[in-house]
Regions:
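Short acidic-aromatic low-complexity motifs
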Residues: 19-23
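C-terminal catalytic core of tyrosine-transesterase DNA break-rejoin enzymes
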Residues: 121
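Vicinal oxygen chelate
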Residues: 1-16, 26-27, 31-118, 128-133
Length: 133
């Protein structure tokens, strides 16, 4: 087995999710505490947004359905969102805004506190406190 040496000094990774209904997904992420940072429209139609929460960004793009309507999105992928904020308060705000949590806030085996939730298109998210050093 060979060991590779890190040569890329990346400063961030920004996922862009292709969603079924961009406005519905915006509402979902706003319930988690994200804010719209940029919007892209064409002819009055919302094509996508860049959301921001703290130092992180997530892009949302409206599916144009050119690849068909029967394809599954979000399969085999989970977004982990780490925060220094109180997980129980974030979960309570999300629930008050109408989100249904998949897993309620709980202590994890690696020492953080987390909850799970699914975005309307099917993308899975875990919102967690940062792992202890």
């Amino acid at each position: 087995m060979s060991i590779t040496v890190e040569t890329l000094q990346a400063t961030s990774i920004v996922p862009n999710l292709t969603v079924d209904d961009v406005q519905q997904s915006i509402t979902f992420f706003q319930a988690l505490g994200f804010a719209v940072d940029e919007r892209w429209e064409e002819g009055g139609t919302l094509l996508g947004v860049m959301l921001r929460a703290g130092e992180t960004r997530i892009g949302l793009s409206q599916d144009d359905w050119k690849k068909g309507r029967d394809r599954k999105k979000g399969v085999g992928m989970r977004l982990f969102i780490a925060t220094r904020q109180d997980i129980d308060q974030i979960a309570a705000r999300a629930k008050a805004a109408g989100l249904a949590l998949d897993v309620e806030p709980h202590d994890t085996e690696w020492g953080s506190r987390a909850f799970d939730v699914t975005e309307p298109t099917g993308f899975k998210l875990t919102v967690s406190t940062e792992q202890p050093a």
